[in-house]
A protein has these predicted regions:
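Acidic, serine/threonine- and proline/glycine-rich intrinsically disordered low-complexity regions
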Residues: 1-32, 173
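Reverse-transcribing Pol proteins
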Residues: 20-151, 231-247
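Reverse-transcriptase-like RNA-dependent polymerase core
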Residues: 54-84, 126-134, 151, 163, ...
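Well-ordered alpha-helical segments embedded in enzymatic catalytic cores
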Residues: 98, 155-158, 218-222
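Generic hydrophobic, aliphatic-rich segments that mediate packing or membrane embedding
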Residues: 102, 119, 152-155, 168, ...
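Structured helix-beta-strand junction loops
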Residues: 109, 165-166
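Conserved pre-catalytic core of RNA-dependent polymerases
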Residues: 114-116, 166-167, 174-175
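Polymerase palm active-site segment centered on the conserved acidic dipeptide of motif C
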Residues: 168-171, 245-251
């Protein structure tokens, strides 16, 4: 599930737990179809690029992000109550095991920490295309009390127009997406979420926070502004597209 799909679900009035449960079967069928067409690293990556394999290594990317100017701030409206609570969603036995594993891994990486926050948002799991479970926080209550960040996302028609002279394309995706951005120091407790095993707060961005897309786009625009100025690199959220008229500038 993409950030955009989750943001759309998060705006609906129906319980997102119910909505996402309805999509499980479709996701499983889609994953089965994808599994039939999986290719090896050598099949997917041209030989001249294989020396960069370490750059895309999953373990190499699991590190706590540095403090940056674009750290995600959660600014609450002046009339926000001093506390709010939530219910706990029921879990299956498999989800309970996944929760314990998730908490262990996230604590080890520093992505979450135990919390004593007066705020508590609910959470549940959804099944990803690869069959694994992903934690999802239901931040609708918090989002309704958050000052909105109006930083714009790129307009799709403008991005497409920049590709008009390109003949060679390469698409890159940022691993772990939102987890590459810290929560601003002092704002972690505002994003606290209640689990069946306790209360925790995020130290990095997760799905569902209302201003996450704007924060992430700010980071990407800042880091890649020089490359984007050439017109041969276009970026939308965690998707990077290198588009050139021939091989020379592409390499």
């Amino acid at each position: 599930m993409t950030e955009e799909e989750w943001e759309e679900i998060n705006q609906q009035e129906e319980d997102p737990y119910t909505i996402l449960r309805k999509t499980t079967t479709a996701s499983e069928l889609a994953q089965k179809a994808m599994d039939k067409t999986k290719k090896t690293f050598e099949q997917m990556v041209p030989e001249e690029y294989r020396r960069h394999a370490r750059t895309f290594n999953e373990k190499e990317s699991q590190r706590f992000p540095l403090e940056r100017p674009w750290d995600h701030a959660i600014e609450l409206l002046p009339d926000t109550p001093k506390s709010f609570d939530c219910k706990i969603y029921p879990m299956t036995a498999g989800e309970d095991d996944s929760l314990r594993e998730f908490i262990r891994e996230q604590l080890e990486k520093g992505y979450i920490q135990p919390s004593k926050s007066p705020y508590a948002s609910p959470f549940f799991f959804i099944k990803k295309k690869d069959g694994k479970l992903r934690l999802v926080q239901d931040y609708r209550k918090l989002n309704s009390l958050t000052v909105k960040n109006q930083y714009p996302l790129p307009l799709i028609p403008e991005l497409i127009d920049k590709l008009r002279n390109a003949t060679l394309f390469m698409k890159l995706d940022i691993r772990w997406g939102y987890n590459n951005v810290r929560i601003k120091e002092g704002d972690q407790e505002k994003g606290a979420f209640k689990t069946n095993l306790g209360l925790y707060e995020p130290c990095v961005m997760f799905f569902g926070l209302t201003n996450s897309p704007s924060t992430f786009q700010t980071m990407m625009d800042t880091i890649f502004q020089d490359l984007m100025a050439t017109g041969e690199v276009v970026i939308y959220m965690d998707d990077i597209l290198i588009a050139t008229p021939n091989n020379t500038p592409h390499h």
